Amino acid sequence: MANAEIGVIGGSGFYSFLEDVSEVQVDTPYGPPSDSLFLGELAGRQVAFLPRHGRSHKVPPHKINYRANLWALRSMGVRQVLGPCAVGGLRAEYGPGTLLVPDQLVDRTKSRTQTFFDGEPLPDGTVPNVVHTTFADPYCPVGRSVALAAARGRGWEPVDGGTMVVVEGPRFSTRAESQWHAAMGWSVVGMTGHPEAVLARELGLCYTSMALVTDLDAGAETGEGVSHTEVLRVFGENVGRLREVLFDAVADLPATESRDCLCTHAHDGWDLGIELP
């Protein structure tokens, strides 16, 4: 089976920028991922792309099989993941078209399975141990630096750091919820950043979020109610720039064998009880 070293999880239009694309269906112990993986070459690197919501956006945020998605990527050889996503801005200065590379995350989801290490037997009879993963810094520091440099190189000055609060969805926040998020000092709000980030960490993957602001959330000073139509419009206007940044980030990520960041040491000293792919 073909392998990749870098994974991109994003909207279904992104795989169109890969060269020599092949579509691969992957089975996992956690069921099927959101869709097939699209393997190809980008910037001289072997990349696996996975449409987070499936083709045609058929899977809502709270129904995404995040465990299967990350497991499938790792089973294909992926060790570094870029996760572009659409978010709402919680500050007036983070208007539509802002690119923010967060360094912190707050989980406000309710029903999502967020660990591989729950002590529940897998289909092959193996049983993962209960593991408490270090997650103080949820994003790869190396990947963040690469993403920031890639954006600046394309003339798109990104916001360096900030907190993404992740809500359950699929509805948008009420005004009261959004005002509370803003009052807490959080930067942007999204629906898919968790448990994607922590599951990547549990698998020893370097994960970098690249958050494109598509609207001012209702709790921002000048924010109105969010509409899905407006989110799609703004994302469509900026997807070309985001592809360019992704291209450069993929080119500049370190070689897999040279990784030595906190992500690679997440389970030092732990007996996982299962073998990772």
Predicted feature residues:
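Short acidic/polar active-site loop segments enriched in Thr and Asp
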Residues: 79-80, 187, 206
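Metabolite-binding pocket within alpha/beta catalytic cores that recognizes anionic/polar moieties
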Residues: 1-135
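Zn-dependent metallopeptidase/amidohydrolase metal-coordination segment
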Residues: 191-229
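Active-site rim beta-loop-alpha module in soluble metabolic enzymes
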Residues: 137-182
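His/Asp/Glu-rich mid-to-C-terminal helical/loop segments that flank catalytic regions of hydrolases
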Residues: 218-268
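Acidic, Ser/Thr-rich low-complexity intrinsically disordered segments
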Residues: 267-277
